[in-house]
């Protein structure tokens, strides 16, 4: 089944679900301002935001009009959670890792060498986090969570974790920043849209990023070496303003609920994740150096970053969270779906 067919069937199912509520008076038209910080040409826009928006509009018989605001039009990348909370946007695509320490439980999804497959991994993270979102993200209403998987892209080939010492690295999120600090690097905190400039000006030597997005942001112009490993997962949430949701009719709420579920988490995660992985072949074809690791080298990486999970358990424990239990639940969900490492 093609990805296009999969999304079409999911959209049809959502539409039929809305129709099944029975004939009702036409709902009052509402606009959903959906903010994200990716360029409009980004794969997630084409494979996630746009299909989702179209499906919502179809299922609501046009009563919910989704207006996409890409490329930080409504605010900076790190501000998108607060934008949804404050009503600047009705819905926002959020990278919780851009605000290190603010969402400590969610950060467990971003621990290194933990997730191997973005589709089932997204479904696993989404199902797991729904038990904690009402407390940790209480200012907003969670739609769903999903992940992509990334690696290290650098100006020089990197095969051993010991080579990280002394480097200046742009981390994907707060958890990756901790990992790089552990390995002896200095973190360069810039958002994705600012990363190419930081690398070209020598402010950073390397970046942790997914494969195809490297091309979307033109970062491939600045780094030519790419270490082939599933180093980390970056986890994201789609969140909405509770007041906006509260003003919807019962029919419209049902439409949104049908689009804010575990199935959509897995579909969006798979569509984007598969596209990201395709970037490796594109870079190799363009003459970039894909750095392959031996099993021994990969084991050395995994051993070197083991303390990060221990640190996470200890950190959340100070806030009364049973870190071992939370992490165990996540890893069991990943294992059940065949998405662990």
Question: What is each PLM-predicted segment?
Answer:
Residues 12, 26-120, 135-341:
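N-terminal secretory/targeting leader peptides
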């Amino acid at each position: 089944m093609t990805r296009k067919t999969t999304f079409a069937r999911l959209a049809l199912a959502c539409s039929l679900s809305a129709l099944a509520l029975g004939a009702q008076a036409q709902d009052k038209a509402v606009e959903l301002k959906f903010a994200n910080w990716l360029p409009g040409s980004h794969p997630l826009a084409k494979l996630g935001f746009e299909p989702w928006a179209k499906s919502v509009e179809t299922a609501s018989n046009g009563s919910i009009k989704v207006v996409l605001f890409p490329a930080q039009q409504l605010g900076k990348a790190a501000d998108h959670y607060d934008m949804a909370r404050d009503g600047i946007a009705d819905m926002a695509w959020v990278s919780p890792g851009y605000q290190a320490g603010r969402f400590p439980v969610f950060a467990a999804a971003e621990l290194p060498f933990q997730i191997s497959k973005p589709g089932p991994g997204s479904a696993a993270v989404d199902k797991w986090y729904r038990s904690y979102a009402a407390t940790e993200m209480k200012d907003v209403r969670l739609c769903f969570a999903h992940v992509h998987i990334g690696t290290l892209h650098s100006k020089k080939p990197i095969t051993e974790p010991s080579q990280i010492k002394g480097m200046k690295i742009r981390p994907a999120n707060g958890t990756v920043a901790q990992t790089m600090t552990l390995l002896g690097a200095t973190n360069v905190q810039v958002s994705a849209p600012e990363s190419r400039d930081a690398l070209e000006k020598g402010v950073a030597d390397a970046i942790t990023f997914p494969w195809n997005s490297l091309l979307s942001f033109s970062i491939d112009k600045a780094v030519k070496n790419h270490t082939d490993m599933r180093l980390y997962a970056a986890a994201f949430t789609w969140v909405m303003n509770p007041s906006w949701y509260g003003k919807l009719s019962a029919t419209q709420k049902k439409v949104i609920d049908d689009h804010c579920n575990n199935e959509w988490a897995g579909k969006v995660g798979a569509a984007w994740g598969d596209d990201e992985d395709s970037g490796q072949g594109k870079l190799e074809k363009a003459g970039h150096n894909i750095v392959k690791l031996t099993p021994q080298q990969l084991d050395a990486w995994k051993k070197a970053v083991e303390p990060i999970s221990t640190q996470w358990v200890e950190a959340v424990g100070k806030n009364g969270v049973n870190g071992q239990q939370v992490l165990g639940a996540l890893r069991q969900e990943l294992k059940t779906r065949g998405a662990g490492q």
